Amino acid sequence: MEIVLEAKERTDKKRSTLRRIRSQGGIPAILYGKKVENKMIFVTAAELEKVLREGGRTS
């Protein structure tokens, strides 16, 4: 089963920007990877909840 989570890249690290993202229903995050540059992203809370509901099922 493939699960897709839509995320948008963010470039601003300011606290005020993070507050604005949260107040608009977003969740700021950072993607880490081996031999890959870190990426600052954000997802909507509704989208994340949807993915967790769909992917959280047991067989």
From Swiss-Prot:
<keyword id="KW-0689">Ribosomal protein</keyword>
<comment type="similarity">
    <text>Belongs to the bacterial ribosomal protein bL25 family.</text>
</comment>
<protein>
    <recommendedName>
        <fullName>Large ribosomal subunit protein bL25</fullName>
    </recommendedName>
</protein>
<dbReference type="InterPro" id="IPR020056">
    <property type="entry name" value="Rbsml_bL25/Gln-tRNA_synth_N"/>
</dbReference>
<dbReference type="GO" id="GO:0005840">
    <property type="term" value="C:ribosome"/>
</dbReference>
<dbReference type="Pfam" id="PF01386">
    <property type="entry name" value="Ribosomal_L25p"/>
</dbReference>
<dbReference type="GO" id="GO:0006412">
    <property type="term" value="P:translation"/>
</dbReference>
<dbReference type="GO" id="GO:0003735">
    <property type="term" value="F:structural constituent of ribosome"/>
</dbReference>
<dbReference type="InterPro" id="IPR029751">
    <property type="entry name" value="Ribosomal_L25_dom"/>
</dbReference>
<dbReference type="GO" id="GO:1990904">
    <property type="term" value="C:ribonucleoprotein complex"/>
</dbReference>
<keyword id="KW-0687">Ribonucleoprotein</keyword>
<dbReference type="InterPro" id="IPR011035">
    <property type="entry name" value="Ribosomal_bL25/Gln-tRNA_synth"/>
</dbReference>
